[in-house]
């Protein structure tokens, strides 16, 4: 990504913190967004650069797009997904079960829908339907 953009990445919590005060982003995409990351977002924990970037960005009342990839979306992570879906400025890339036979609680985002999700989120809309057919 650094080669494509010509910009240095953000690799520390301290480097992520100015995202908010400086208004550096229009939108933030977290892809993939694991169950652990969603749990920490829901709990307000900022112990990684990604989580600090999200917290700092949300100070500006701007959208955060989550692209879920978790083996327990229909288990322990479900409460966090529900909480985040009901929280202002969080938008989800539509997702579905990736292997309902071997991993019945697992769901992953339809990543090909990230661009459409970004467009919708920038207009304050959640791309629908959020839960889609299995892969």
Describe these PLM feature segments.
Residues 1-64, 71-135:
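A cross-family phosphate/adenosyl-ligand binding-site feature
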